[in-house]
């Protein structure tokens, strides 16, 4: 399970679905310039894609009192940036049948974790910079995709038990992944995005999140720090626990941002999650 084998695995993955590729083309000129009518029409033409998007946006922690029943309503409420993330998330998971048990979580728990990362990014960072929050929230939703590749590699190896045990004991999943594979799941996500010709800035951020590959400048480093905040607060071992929120809050302070606001948002998102878990 070396790095070269991972690259070969990614290179062998088939293209995304026709619907996903058509939607990607709509975003070529930027999410703010997307033709909403065409976007809704393409999503509605793919019954499974439409159903998956509606399922995700009706998640309890979004807090809608009434069920969102149409794609048009979903796009109107969430905007084109979030819809991009939802479409890409579904399209990638179509091509990577994940064995998330390698990370000691179920597929449902993995999806909930990704949604919570995106929701936290949007709710926290929108007060700081709404436009960039809209750009970063979809990335937060799909940045864990590399774990699906690594999990499948582990499941097919003789090291499954050792990997699961290592994940459960690890205080830093990225360090553990690097020791195991010579790379991290976020860098693998960058390779996946590159393979499928997704947003180039997403590729750059993911590839430099754990492994400084190039001089990316202070602005890009700042946005990478926002991803670090979110993945520290919400990850496979800790989903908005008291400890993970506190650790993420320290990063927020290092960014010279209001950590009290971050903690308030994190705990607000945590409440419905905790309620559901206890049911």
Predicted features and spans:
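Divalent-cation-assisted or electrostatically stabilized phosphate/pyrophosphate-binding catalytic cores
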Residues: 73, 160-188, 257-259
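Short, mixed-charge aromatic SLiMs
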Residues: 78-79, 114, 144, 170-177, ...
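Conserved alpha-helical "signature site"
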Residues: 1-142, 149-155, 180, 187-204, ...
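Terminal helices and disordered tails flanking the catalytic cores of nucleotide-processing hydrolases
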Residues: 1-5, 244-279
